[in-house]
């Protein structure tokens, strides 16, 4: 028997299709002639790259196969990619990768680079040649980047997603899922399944909005709870089939600590800094600035984050925070698109008030360098009393709402969700 690893990416487009659908079909077919080593993998890559379709996800799967079946399996994969990829869209550039034997450790490092950085096709071709990986490019073949990364990702931390697919005649039509049943299931399975609904808006989150074949995607950390949730939701249209993926979704895979001067466009990062410019608003987006010992950075809570912006507005100059998110150019300025933040130290907020009249307790009013009582006319030298105003921010992590959350960002309700933020506190400054 031979270990055969298969990676696929960039088969979809905004018009339709889904790489997970193609991957699920292949996993079912190949499992008839080879032994799966695990569930298929869904690996989310750098969420900031400009040419992603939707979630920038690649798929991979591994089998024990007989030597005589290897060519048959490879041909099946290539034929299905040719048949089902969205070649009508100019930005669809599929890539397929085959690796036999053990997965090289170097490919694991490549996988994380594909999540943290912006890689190009040459980077993928070079590592493929070095590792003797078999690559197949369709058109530009950009998909080989994700295909290699999906094979190489070790999924040391992972979640599950159950994806149910629609019958073809329903593709492109409104999805029919009973809303009340989704809320009921969420109530019974949360937090072992999560991001099913947005309670603050009363909306369902498991149904995508595009023309792709996915009816629902149910995420969770307990595979059995995910299956139970699926079985207890009421669907008002037929389901073709479903597939469970192991995935790096909601693992914070994309976040690494960086100094501000080290940041580049398309990075995802955690930074630590002091607020040097209080918030301002433009087009319903909320901005502020922080600095560390290497430079300053604009930070943004964009309009889709809704109520999260309320907490951003509570920050004032002098506050020290840890902030996490994606880095991009916005109106020509390098900007951190905020996903979560943690106030480490809150500066004191002080106001100064006039004292009461010492004679009659009346209200004093300012008269140049003096205060004069409105009631009895008593005068005294102006002395204002400092008063500390309580800060509404707590020393805790604040995160964007579920419908604004990136695929890789870990909800605070999950185990280890605070680790990457709090680990920054352990670093020497």
Curated annotation (Swiss-Prot):
One of its GO terms (cellular component) is cytoplasm. This is tRNA(Ile2) 2-agmatinylcytidine synthetase TiaS. ATP-dependent agmatine transferase that catalyzes the formation of 2-agmatinylcytidine (agm2C) at the wobble position (C34) of tRNA(Ile2), converting the codon specificity from AUG to AUA. It is found in: Cytoplasm. CDD domains: RPA2_OBF_like (cd04482). Residues 271-343 bind DNA. It catalyses: cytidine(34) in tRNA(Ile2) + agmatine + ATP + H2O = 2-agmatinylcytidine(34) in tRNA(Ile2) + AMP + 2 phosphate + 2 H(+).
């Amino acid at each position: 028997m031979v270990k055969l690893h298969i990676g696929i990416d960039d088969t979809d487009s905004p018009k339709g299709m889904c790489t997970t659908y193609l991957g699920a079909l292949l996993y079912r077919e190949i499992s008839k002639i080879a032994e799966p080593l695990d569930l298929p993998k869904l690996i989310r890559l750098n969420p900031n790259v400009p040419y992603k379709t939707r979630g920038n996800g690649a798929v991979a799967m591994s089998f024990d196969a007989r030597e005589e079946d290897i060519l048959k399996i490879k041909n099946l994969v290539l034929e299905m990619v040719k048949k089902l990829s969205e070649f009508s869209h100019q930005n669809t550039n599929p890539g397929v990768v085959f690796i036999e034997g053990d997965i090289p450790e170097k490919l694991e490092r490549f996988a994380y680079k594909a999540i943290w950085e912006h890689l190009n096709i040459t980077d993928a071709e070079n590592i493929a040649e070095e590792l003797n990986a078999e690559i197949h490019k369709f058109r530009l073949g950009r998909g080989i980047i994700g295909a290699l990364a999906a094979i190489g990702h070790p999924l040391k931390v992972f979640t599950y997603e159950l994806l149910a697919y629609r019958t073809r005649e329903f593709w492109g039509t409104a999805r029919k899922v009973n809303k009340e049943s989704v809320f009921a299931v969420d109530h019974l399975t949360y937090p072992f399944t999560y991001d099913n609904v947005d309670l603050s808006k009363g909306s369902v989150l498991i149904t995508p909005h595009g023309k792709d074949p996915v009816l629902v995607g149910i995420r969770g950390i307990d595979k059995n709870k995910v299956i139970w949730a699926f079985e207890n939701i009421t669907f008002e249209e037929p389901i073709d089939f479903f597939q469970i993926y192991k995935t790096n979704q909601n693992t914070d895979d994309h976040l690494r600590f960086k100094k501000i001067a080290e940041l580049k466009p398309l990075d995802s990062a955690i930074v630590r800094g002091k607020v040097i410019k209080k918030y301002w608003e433009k087009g319903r987006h909320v901005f502020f600035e922080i600095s560390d010992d290497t430079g300053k950075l604009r930070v943004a809570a964009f309009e889709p984050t809704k109520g999260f912006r309320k907490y951003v507005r509570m920050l004032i100059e002098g506050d020290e925070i840890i902030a996490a998110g994606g880095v991009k150019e916005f109106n020509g300025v390098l900007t951190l698109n905020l996903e979560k933040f943690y106030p480490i130290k809150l500066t004191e907020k002080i106001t100064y008030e006039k004292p009461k009249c010492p004679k009659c307790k009346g209200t004093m009013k300012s008269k140049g360098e003096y205060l004069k009582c409105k009631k009895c006319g008593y005068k005294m030298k102006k002395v204002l009393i400092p008063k500390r105003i309580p800060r509404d921010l707590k020393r805790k992590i604040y995160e964007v709402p579920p419908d604004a959350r990136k695929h890789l960002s870990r909800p605070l309700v999950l185990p280890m969700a605070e680790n990457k933020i709090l680990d920054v506190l352990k670093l020497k400054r």
